């Protein structure tokens, strides 16, 4: 719980700075934070180094400086990451990245979701389905596609805290309940 509060607070702070600097800064900082999060996920040793209380702040800053140099981070991002090091908050970097991504999506009007189907869809069908869903919802969608043979047919769309279940499994479940009640 406290992890979430800390991560959200720092994500809000760097996002507010990005808003002042313009849309390009918002996007580039989002990309930088996402790349940092991916680097930490891909290299557990790096993640452990930045989280370790045994390693000094200056050593952590040196590692961050090299990493941020490779990512071509602007001075504000560098200062932000160094502040996290000074405040012993580098352990929250991945969570900060995730929260920043949510804030950025919200600012751009993008809704992320998952579309589950019973069979694998072609790229053309995915594009048409995405376009149709965007028209119906009135928002820009970023969808990930998954296959679950257990739904038998149809689809299940998960967007945020909403679930639209248009699967054959759900329809059969409704039919079963109707028969049980004797309607």
Curated annotation (Swiss-Prot):
Stored InterPro entries: ATP_synth_OSCP/delta_N_sf, ATPase_OSCP/d_CS, ATPase_OSCP/dsu
Cellular compartment(s): Cell inner membrane
Membrane topology: Peripheral membrane protein
SUPFAM superfamilies linked: N-terminal domain of the delta subunit of the F1F0-ATP synthase (SSF47928)
Record-level GO cellular component terms: plasma membrane; proton-transporting ATP synthase complex
Predominant cellular place of this UniProt entry's protein: membrane
Keywords per UniProt: ATP synthesis, Cell inner membrane, Cell membrane, CF(1), Hydrogen ion transport, Ion transport, Membrane, Transport
GO molecular function, one term: proton-transporting ATP synthase activity, rotational mechanism
Annotated HAMAP family: ATP_synth_delta_bact
Physiological role: F(1)F(0) ATP synthase produces ATP from ADP in the presence of a proton or sodium gradient. F-type ATPases consist of two structural domains, F(1) containing the extramembraneous catalytic core and F(0) containing the membrane proton channel, linked together by a central stalk and a peripheral stalk. During catalysis, ATP synthesis in the catalytic domain of F(1) is coupled via a rotary mechanism of the central stalk subunits to proton translocation. This protein is part of the stalk that links CF(0) to CF(1). It either transmits conformational changes from CF(0) to CF(1) or is implicated in proton conduction.
Assembly, per entry: F-type ATPases have 2 components, F(1) - the catalytic core - and F(0) - the membrane proton channel. F(1) has five subunits: alpha(3), beta(3), gamma(1), delta(1), epsilon(1). F(0) has three main subunits: a(1), b(2) and c(10-14). The alpha and beta chains form an alternating ring which encloses part of the gamma chain. F(1) is attached to F(0) by a central stalk formed by the gamma and epsilon chains, while a peripheral stalk is formed by the delta and b chains.
NCBIfam families in the cross-refs: ATP_synt_delta
Family: Belongs to the ATPase delta chain family.
Name of this protein: ATP synthase subunit delta
Organism the protein comes from: Desulfovibrio desulfuricans (strain ATCC 27774 / DSM 6949 / MB)
Gene behind this protein: atpH
């Amino acid at each position: 719980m406290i992890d979430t509060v800390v991560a959200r607070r720092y994500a809000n702070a760097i996002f507010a700075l990005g808003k002042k600097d313009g849309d390009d800064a918002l996007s580039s900082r989002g990309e930088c934070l996402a790349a940092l999060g991916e680097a930490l996920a891909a290299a557990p040793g790096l993640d452990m180094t930045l989280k370790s209380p045994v390693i000094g702040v200056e050593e952590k800053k040196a590692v961050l400086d090299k990493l941020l140099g490779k990512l071509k981070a602007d001075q504000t991002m560098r200062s932000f990451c160094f502040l996290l090091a000074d405040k012993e908050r580098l352990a929250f970097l991945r969570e900060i990245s995730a929260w920043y991504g949510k804030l950025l999506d919200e600012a751009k009007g993008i809704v992320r979701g998952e579309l589950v189907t019973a069979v694998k869809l072609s790229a053309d069908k995915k594009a048409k389905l995405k376009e149709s869903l965007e028209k119906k919802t009135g928002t820009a969608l970023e969808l990930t596609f998954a296959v679950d043979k257990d739904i038998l047919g149809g689809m299940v769309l998960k967007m945020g805290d909403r679930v639209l279940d248009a699967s054959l499994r759900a329809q059969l479940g409704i039919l079963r309940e109707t028969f049980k009640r004797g309607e």
